[in-house]
Amino acid sequence: MKYTELVPHETKKRLRDRIGSVLLTLTAPQVVLDPLHRPGEYVFPWLSLCLASGGNREYLNLSFEKRQTAAGQDYHRLHIIASDDPSCEHGTHREYPYDTRYPAVLMDIGARITDVHFLTHTAINNETGEEIEEESTLILHLDNGVCLHIVPQFLGDFVTTEYMVLRIIPA
């Protein structure tokens, strides 16, 4: 296994262009699926980032989409929808509309993004030798020393692309 940066170029560029922006808030429906989650870990079907730069606000809705290789192997890729519409902060999402059964969670951050990294966990199919992207990770470094890791949620042997884990790594 190796870790490589295999997130599509346009997604990387969209987020790297946000370096220097202030991450104001994180919004998501309050969903915790895994009873073994650790302190500082939160499980959501989608996550919205509210960013401020030069007096403008932007909302990035993040989720994971399921894709298939030519050989039919499933893998997961980070999917981002950008908007300047404030309603996006409260759950509007093309693939995962807001579910009123789960109240939104709002975390005030107020820290500047200093760096953005992408890691993709790549496995080798033993039968074909084909490389398969299994777990994309987005890492946001903030100027207060905190790192935010956003990864797909794995539930035992079952993988769902409809949920993600937010890990807050303190300074």
Where are these regions (language model features)?
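Surface-exposed, interaction-prone regions used to assemble/regulate multi-protein complexes
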Residues: 1-171
